[in-house]
From Swiss-Prot:
InterPro entries: CysJ-like_FAD-binding (IPR003097), FAD-bd_FR_type (IPR017927), Flavdoxin-like (IPR001094), Flavodoxin/NO_synth (IPR008254), Flavoprot_Pyr_Nucl_cyt_Rdtase (IPR001709), Flavoprotein-like_sf (IPR029039), FNR_nucleotide-bd (IPR039261), NADPH_Cyt_P450_Rdtase_alpha (IPR023173). PROSITE patterns: FAD_FR (PS51384), FLAVODOXIN_LIKE (PS50902). This is NADPH--cytochrome P450 reductase. Residues 80-224 form the Flavodoxin-like domain. It is a single-pass membrane protein. The gene is POR. It comes from Bos taurus (Bovine). It catalyses: 2 oxidized [cytochrome P450] + NADPH = 2 reduced [cytochrome P450] + NADP(+) + H(+). Residues 279-521 form the FAD-binding FR-type domain. SUPFAM superfamilies: Ferredoxin reductase-like, C-terminal NADP-linked domain (SSF52343), Flavoproteins (SSF52218), Riboflavin synthase domain-like (SSF63380).
Length: 678
């Protein structure tokens, strides 16, 4: 048994050994196969990936080269580049004028949108002989860069690039009624110097509250002699008229390829695709358009735009931008006085084939479309337009007057101020008053600036109205010194936008949302003090709606105070019922209304602020309250700010200078916010 058991055991051991050996061999074979397959797959996969990777690298390289403005300047023989930061088109217009000036000095210039180029390329600019970078930089809102200059601003803040050898000059566009007057232009000028660039002429400060055109002309007439002296060049002659675009008339054009008012992509209004922005606005349906006031002297209105299915998101305090259309009667009058067929399909093509800007507005299109949707025909034209138009005045006196107004002489500046600006003469009025002035319509379309979007503070909260954006506006209409009646382009156009009726017609508004820093505090318990006379109440309707919504959600909400001003309670008390309802429900802690014309002595919002000075100081100093001011920048905002200086000085027992510093620190911390206009 023992032997049998031993034999049996031996046999079992051998069998186990054989099994172990068998599985080990199988494992090795399988492992080898797996490794082989994986290796082959990996190599195969890698090869397959190398093709798109290589293509991607080529694309990136090409893209980088396209964004090199220095390479473009070398290729096209230019040595002056004029960058513009523009929100309303004025800075871009000034940049174009400066780039055209260059030819008078044997130089070649180009205007450039900083958004389209890599500004790190500035360090390579000295590779071009007698190269100069000019910056026409507007300031938007409260010291912010314009949308197209935001990336440039961010780059300047982050970079430490050496700009030694770079020559530059800056002209800033701003408004002195704003707290941060010309902040962007001043920053660019200072920062470029810090990075080693050489300023060849003093910073220019344009003030739109005064005469921006005169500020620019005065700076420009001193700037070019400084450039000549620096580079050792001389002017080649008098300023001459040089066409930038050539006319092409289309006699047999497929209408499907013709622009009919789109801002960017052809047929974008027929085939709407997000995201929606300045170059791709959303066509919103007007669902509500009601008059807010009882009086007949002015028309104040509340509109609601449907943004369902647009994927547009907004927050209380944001702005809505709308693209208006010019009055068809004005357009028709222009066509008649120029003897032009407005329905001709045409294109204006840039004579500079290397330019990024192929057309002054979307082409091909008709003159009617251009004058209705693309060109500004209601603002007084600038001096460069008058200079170019003068050649078409056949009557010597009219020709002389136009050239004089376009000159930099004191007499010319005074005449332009009085005859054009103060009289608010638009292009049609000038053509009517100068009968011999009859320019070709295509040249006029080349000269007129682009019609710009108008911005309105959104008068709703997305928490309550996620599918609609509300606008509060006053229709502008006034008589000029010449007896003409001028109307606001956008507000008159909005006023006529009737909601869909029984006939099924829809009133549409091209729009997009622009983000703002005008925001409610992060903590709902933080008290808010809102000051907004007239249509300045608009963003506060959204703020109050949001605070009311938070209360309905069971959230604890801090004190909400509104200081609102209007003329009379029975004339222009906007959102009267809504505000009374919020006050009754407790969402609005205090509703303080100043009526400026209801009693012999005028009462303004600042008077009501002084009346509540003790409580306001407690909310600000102890409660961490946030202050918001919306409305007129020239008078109201300044007076309100001075009132807060007085309150802080008196209640905080401070000297005036200390009180000013206290309020300025509130601004720096985001506790004193402004949404103002002039």
């Amino acid at each position: 048994m023992a032997d049998s058991n031993m034999d049996a055991g031996t046999t079992t051991s051998e069998m186990v050994a054989e099994e172990v050996s068998l599985f080990s061999t199988t494992d090795v074979i399988l492992f080898s196969l797996i490794v082989g397959v994986m290796t082959y797959w990996f190599l195969f996969r890698k090869k397959k990936e190398e093709v798109p990777e290589f293509t991607k690298i080529q694309t990136t390289t090409s893209s980088v080269k396209d964004r090199s403005f220095v390479e473009k300047m070398k290729k096209t023989g230019r040595n002056i580049i004029v960058f513009y930061g523009s929100q309303t088109g004025t800075a871009e217009e000034f940049a174009n004028r400066l780039s055209k000036d260059a030819h008078r000095y044997g130089m070649r210039g180009m205007a450039a949108d900083p958004e389209e180029y890599d500004l790190a390329d500035l360090s390579s600019l000295p590779e071009i002989e007698k190269a100069l970078a000019i910056f026409c930089m507007a300031t938007y809102g409260e010291g912010d860069p314009t949308d197209n200059a935001q990336d440039f601003y961010d780059w300047l803040q982050e970079t430490d690039v050496d700009l030694s050898g770079v020559k530059y000059a800056v002209f800033a566009l701003g408004n002195k009624t704003y707290e941060h007057f010309n902040a962007m232009g001043k920053y660019v000028d200072k920062r470029l110097e810090q990075l080693g660039a050489q300023r060849i002429f003093d910073l220019g400060l344009g003030d739109d509250d005064g005469n921006l055109e005169e500020d620019f002309i005065t700076w420009r007439e001193q700037f070019w002699p400084a450039v000549c002296e620096h580079f050792g060049v001389e002017a080649t002659g008098e300023e001459s008229s040089i066409r930038q675009y050539e006319l092409m008339v289309h006699t047999d054009m497929d209408m499907a390829k013709v622009y009919t008012g789109e801002m960017g992509r052809l047929k974008s209004y027929e085939n709407q695709k997000p995201p929606f922005d300045a170059k791709n606005p959303f066509l919103a349906v007007v669902t509500t358009n009601r008059k807010l006031n009882q009086g007949t002297e002015r028309h104040l209105m509340h509109l609601e735009l449907d943004i369902s299915d647009s994927k547009i998101r907004y927050e209380s305090g944001d702005h809505v931008a709308v693209y208006p259309a010019n009055d068809s009667a004005l357009v028709n009058q222009l066509g008649e006085i120029l003897g032009a067929d407005l329905d001709i399909i045409m294109s204006l093509n840039n004579l500079d084939e290397e330019s990024n800007k192929k057309h002054p507005f979307p082409c091909p299109t008709s003159y009617r479309t251009a004058l209705t949707y693309y060109l500004d025909i209601t603002n007084p034209p600038r001096t460069n337009v008058l200079y170019e138009l003068a050649q078409y005045a056949s009557e010597p006196t009219e020709h002389e007057q136009l050239r004089k107004m376009a000159s930099s002489s004191g007499e010319g500046k005074e005449l332009y101020l009085r005859w054009v600006l103060e009289a608010r003469r638009h292009i049609l009025a000038i053509l009517q008053d100068y009968p011999s002035l009859r320019p070709p319509i295509d040249h006029l379309c080349e000269l007129l600036p682009r019609l710009q979007a108008r911005y309105y503070s959104i008068a709703s909260s997305s928490k309550v109205h996620p599918n609609s954006v509300h606008i509060c506006a006053v229709a502008v209409e006034y008589e000029t010194k010449t007896g003409r009646i001028n109307k606001g382009v956008a507000t008159s156009w909005l006023r006529a936008k009737e909601p869909a009726g029984e006939n099924g017609g829809r009133a549409l508004v091209p729009m997009y949302v622009r983000k703002s820093q005008f925001r409610l505090p992060f903590k709902a318990t933080t008290p808010v003090i809102m000051v907004g006379p007239g249509t300045g109440v608009a963003p506060f309707i959204g703020f109050i709606q949001e605070r009311a919504w938070l209360r309905q959600q069971g959230k604890e909400v801090g004190e909400t105070l509104l200081y609102y001003g209007c003329r009379r309670s029975d004339e222009d008390y906007l959102y009267r019922e809504e505000l009374a309802g919020f006050h009754k429900d407790g969402a609005l802690t205090q509703l303080n209304v100043a009526f400026s014309r209801e009693q012999p002595q005028k009462v303004y919002v600042q008077h009501l602020l002084k009346k509540d000075k003790e409580h306001l100081w407690k909310l600000i100093h102890e409660g961490g309250a946030h202050i918001y001011v919306c409305g007129d920048a020239r008078n109201m905002a300044r007076d309100v700010q001075n009132t807060f200086y007085d309150i802080v000085a008196e209640q905080g027992a401070m000297e005036h200078a200390q009180a000013v510093d206290y309020v300025k620190k509130l601004m720096t911390k985001g506790r004193y916010s402004l949404d103002v206009w002039s």
